[in-house]
């Protein structure tokens, strides 16, 4: 077997055993955090669904749309390492910054809160410190497109967004598209 054939076989073996999730093989990740079962907490899911309809197939080759739900964003972020292709993460979530319900706030990495926590589980784990760590350790640009929630029904199930937050979905999509397309 010549050297060219050996190299080709090794390359195929590497691909077979590459366990990197597909969303970490793209330059940009739009990470939706939320749960449609809890009223306005489902904001990000609606944003991701609209982006999925609007983005072209060519754009989707470099942009990963990840609906991580309420508990999985931390797991998604902890999989990032030096082999990840991700250069930018746009997190979409509801926020509580004391602004008007439905108002959109863009939060840069340096503005992320730094909460102290003692208990560690996937529902109470603050995302901001992990976002900051990933951004700094792997030189990834991070932004949060946050929408001030009006009503989060948890633990009660309520499917549907408040009127204010529903109106904010299109605005968030426009902001994200400008960020993705460089408009």
From Swiss-Prot:
Pfam families: HycI. One of its GO terms (biological process) is protein processing. The lineage of its organism: Archaea, Methanobacteriati, Methanobacteriota, Methanomada group, Methanococci. CDD domains: H2MP_F420-Reduc. NCBIfam families: frhD (TIGR00130), hydrog_prot (TIGR00072). InterPro entries: Pept_A31_F420-red_hyd_d (IPR004411), Pept_HybD-like_dom_sf (IPR023430), Peptidase_A31 (IPR000671). GO terms for molecular function: aspartic-type endopeptidase activity; endopeptidase activity; enzyme activator activity. It comes from Methanocaldococcus jannaschii (strain ATCC 43067 / DSM 2661 / JAL-1 / JCM 10045 / NBRC 100440) (Methanococcus jannaschii). The gene is frhD. The keyword Protease applies. Keywords: Aspartyl protease, Hydrolase, Protease. This is Coenzyme F420 hydrogenase subunit delta. Belongs to the peptidase A31 family.
